[in-house]
A protein has these predicted regions:
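Terminal targeting signals and extreme-terminal segments of soluble enzymes
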Residues: 1-190
Length: 190
């Protein structure tokens, strides 16, 4: 992502900056939303020293390739185990996105997943997703995307389906060391 600290104003607020560059943008040459969320989460985690457990973003505008995006972080409530945080991402005076997040962890002796992974073919059994346009210098150039359920562009017709899509997605450069920022980038498909 290329996000770097650019000013810490105290224990509960600080600023990070990143240049929106090729590789973190869409085909329209603006910041991929998941990369914006990832930048905010990375800054929140760095300031708080805690791992993100939940985050949501509201996208308000676009950050174009070559622009510098500042990420202003505020730790609104610092609890013993959980911190509530906010990040406002701007290019100049223009707000790009706002992020609210909870970071930290609470000891709990039980672990459970409430969602069962669907029974689907492995990625190696599926073909790489086709794109309508050139993906050079976009986030899609860095990803492998394979449809399990869904229709490729050439399969679209006038007949609607149930709207359900299942897809394998990964960033091969980040196979080892997947963190919450990486999951935020991939989460933009949801």
């Amino acid at each position: 992502l290329g996000i770097e600290p650019s000013g810490v104003f105290g224990p509960t607020n600080g600023r990070w900056s990143m240049i929106v560059r090729p590789g973190v943008v869409t085909g329209g040459n603006f910041l991929w939303g998941g990369c914006g969320l990832a930048a905010a989460v990375a800054a929140i985690e760095e300031l708080s020293g805690r791992t993100c457990v939940w985050a949501t973003a509201q996208y308000l505008s676009y950050a174009r390739t070559g622009e510098t995006m500042d990420v202003d972080v505020t730790l609104a409530v610092v609890g013993h185990q959980i911190t509530q945080a906010r990040a406002v991402c701007r290019v100049g005076d223009r707000e790009i996105l706002t992020v609210n997040a909870a970071v930290g962890e609470r000891p709990f002796e039980y672990a459970h997943s409430f969602v069962k992974m669907p029974d689907v073919p492995p990625p190696s059994a599926l073909k790489q997703r086709a794109h309508r346009s050139d993906v050079s210098n976009t986030i899609h150039e860095k990803m492998e995307e394979r449809f399990v359920i869904g229709r490729e562009l050439e399969e679209l017709d006038e007949i609607p389906n149930d709207g359900r899509t299942l897809m394998w997605a990964r960033i091969p450069d980040v196979i080892d060391g997947v963190d919450t920022a990486t999951l935020a980038v991939l989460g933009d498909f949801v």
